[in-house]
Amino acid sequence: MDKKSFEMVLDEIRKAVLTEYKLKAIEYVHGYFSSEQVVDLLRYFSWAEPQLKAMKALQHKMVAVQPTEVVNILNCFTFSKDKLVALELLASNIIDAQNSRPIEDLFRVNMSEKKRCKRILEQAFKGGCKAPHAMISSCGTIPGNPYPKGRPSRINGIFPGTPLKKDGEECTNEGKGIAARILGPSKPPPSTYNPHKPVPYPIPPCRPHATIAPSAYNNAGLVPLANVIAPPPPPYTPNPVGTENEDLSNPSKPIQNQTFSTPASQLFSPHGSNPSTPAATPVPTASPVKAINHPSASAAATVSGMNLLNTVLPVFPGQVSSAVHTPQPSIPNPTVIRTPSLPTAPVTSIHSTTTTPVPSIFSGLVSLPGPSATPTAATPTPGPTPRSTLGSSEAFASTSAPFTSLPFSTSSSAASTSNPNSASLSSVFAGLPLPLPPTSQGLSNPTPVIAGGSTPSVAGPLGVNSPLLSALKGFLTSNDTNLINSSALSSAVTSGLASLSSLTLQNSDSSASAPNKCYAPSAIPTPQRTSTPGLALFPGLPSPVANSTSTPLTLPVQSPLATAASASTSVPVSCGSSASLLRGPHPGTSDLHISSTPAATTLPVMIKTEPTSPTPSAFKGPSHSGNPSHGTLGLSGTLGRAYTSTSVPISLSACLNPALSGLSSLSTPLNGSNPLSSISLPPHGSSTPIAPVFTALPSFTSLTNNFPLTGNPSLNPSVSLPGSLIATSSTAATSTSLPHPSSTAAVLSGLSASAPVSAAPFPLNLSTAVPSLFSVTQGPLSSSNPSYPGFSVSNTPSVTPALPSFPGLQAPSTVAAVTPLPVAATAPSPAPVLPGFASAFSSNFNSALVAQAGLSSGLQAAGSSVFPGLLSLPGIPGFPQNPSQSSLQELQHNAAAQSALLQQVHSASALESYPAQPDGFPSYPSAPGTPFSLQPSLSQSGWQ
């Protein structure tokens, strides 16, 4: 056998594991082995039995051998008895059998074996050699191919059970991996297969999955990510449930929807229906909400919402701010709206109820215009409606249902709902959202929310339209002055916050009480569920905004709030804070109020600051907003909450800061706006804020404390929602609050809690915070679980981190980020968020944030987005987004900035991140919207 063929045989024998397979490798051979080859083959068989079997297999596959060669073969065997057996097998292949001396010498010891050996050789001689001679050894075989019918390893497999090989397959394993060697060749393709020819059936499209974020500016509906784009809306719109289903695919929208649907329904039928409605009827609202959910709807809604917003503004022209607001609204709104969606979702998640509301809220946002949101039609009407709403607040509530649905069903609820989500979102959005949310709530809600709290008095008017608008606007308005000035953006955002606040304020101003109240509720609601909290949130905002004026009112708004507010009020700043604090607090003044005070303080400070100073400006809207927000939100002591709310956006830092700080410090200083402000706000103002933020953070840490601090009682009281929120969150206090609130609270709480939890880390270190955040997040999240929690956690952390990162603006950014987080869902992905955060923070906080936000769920994205949602806030984010802090500041400073912010935000990665944005705001508001949109999905999933 030629060398190549023999190598193939050896390869087959080596591959075979079992003796039977090794023997088959020999039996399948076509060809003859020389004596040397036989000796080589026998080496692969151990011991006598396998070797003899191999000899038997080789018996008829050998070339004739000489006696001396026979000796070499026999020497492969150890025992003479085995050698005799082998000799018998080889006998017929021996050429010169007569010359048997060399063979016989092997059996000299045992006479019987020697005799037998002779006998075998004699018979072989008689029979003659039957083996072919070497010259013809290859007869009948193809050189180089000992297995013309296929290698045994391919035919029978190497191991028992391995598939049989088929002819025509390559015979070598050279260069094959171990798996290929063991498994053998893969099944050959069918003969009809032509890789160059298209298949006769359609190749199913790849399931949409998030890979590279679609362009944030993509309005073409190409981005399946969050179903943000308009096309998807229908599903949502159809009805929450549908949406819900979609949820899976599109977490963001689904959740929202889900929220909507579930929570809504769950929460309350009204809401349930509302959601539907929103989806269906209140286009604006629903749309928005849904829109938010569904991009398209969203868009429409959003748009409408936007318009509405604007409209609302007009509607609420009462609010002077309106005008100012308007711009904001538009931006924010969209943003908000957009955001809402995310937030909503997240929120939703968080609170189911809330969530729903959130959507609502957002919707409301969108709706805003439509306080009538609920009533879609009302939209424009909303203005009035809201007013009515206020009155209707309740209605709102119902209308708001979404919001309402929240626990606060009432406006508060709505607000709350909103808040939580909204709040968060809203809050985040700052007043805007808040208002929006309220709006969403029905717009009315907003009113209610805002108004709601406010309902009581002015609220209606103010609140209502204002709230949303007003709120925004009001915020603006009130702040407006400053704020507005500050930057529409800021303003707007802030405004939103402020507006809330302002709203409140404004209202407050105008009808201070109510408005404030309204706001508060709004804000509060969120968190609180109680109106207060919500209000507080905003109220704080408002309050702050209102600052004094409002304050009282603000406070009033909540009544509880009010009280707190009052107290706060007294400190106007406080007020806001208070309210915020209050928010939850107020109601418990005591419980809340502490908060409130602090909150108020914070708030006010914030607010004040904002308007007042550029710094705030820096946060500018945010800051400011933040403040208010804070106040409201954060302040609210909630901080978290606040965060949640606008506050976050507001300034994170402020918010946080103030909130926290304020919280803690503020608490007293409520008015201390100074403190707050100084602490937070001012600091916050720009850079300080950060410190404050940190402070706040620490506060945060304290936050809890703070909260508690602030709202010690408040906090304690879970009731205080805010506190509770925070506290709750941490505590669980939520419990009280809220259950929803809880969530909210939780959220906030989460925040808080988280903060607290992480408190230290969180608070202080942003960086740490981030991780902390994470951790916190996690915890709080869980605790917060409610929507915010995550948010809070994340939020907080985010905030913190952000803050630190960018002291001045960052904080806000952070805040914003945070907010979003919370909003978004922070929960959803707290971690993600955080992570994003962290990195985002560092780098550009905002954008990262935002981008990350995507991660965050949107919320984060929202970061910028969120804020964007804030719109004004966004500004914040924007700021942050603007990578440069200065930019931030600048932005803050001007309204233009605001839009720029938006844009920036938008442009910022965040937006990019969230192309999903398409939600409804493609344009917008990409950023803001986007994040939210995305968020929802993110968040949603997370929350879910």
Curated annotation (Swiss-Prot):
What Pfam families does this protein map onto? Answer: DUF4476
Q: Does the keyword Cell inner membrane apply?
A: no
Q: Where is the composition biased (Polar residues)?
A: 248-274, 932-944
Please give the residue positions where the record annotates the modification N-acetylmethionine: 1
InterPro entries in alphabetical order: DUF4476, PROSER1
Task: List residues traversing the bilayer.
Answer: none
Acetylation recorded as keyword: yes
In this chain, the stretch annotated as Disordered covers 233-285, 369-396, 608-633, 912-944
Where are the compositionally biased (Low complexity) regions? 275-285
Q: Which keywords has UniProt assigned to this entry?
A: Acetylation
- What is the stated purpose of this protein? Mediates OGT interaction with and O-GlcNAcylation of TET2 to control TET2 stabilization at enhancers and CpG islands (CGIs).
How this chain assembles, per its entry, is: Interacts with TET2 and OGT; this interaction mediates TET2 O-GlcNAcylation and stability by promoting the interaction between OGT and TET2. Interacts with KDM6A. Interacts with TET1.
What PANTHER family is this protein classified in?
Answer: PROLINE AND SERINE-RICH PROTEIN 1
The name on file for this protein is Proline and serine-rich protein 1
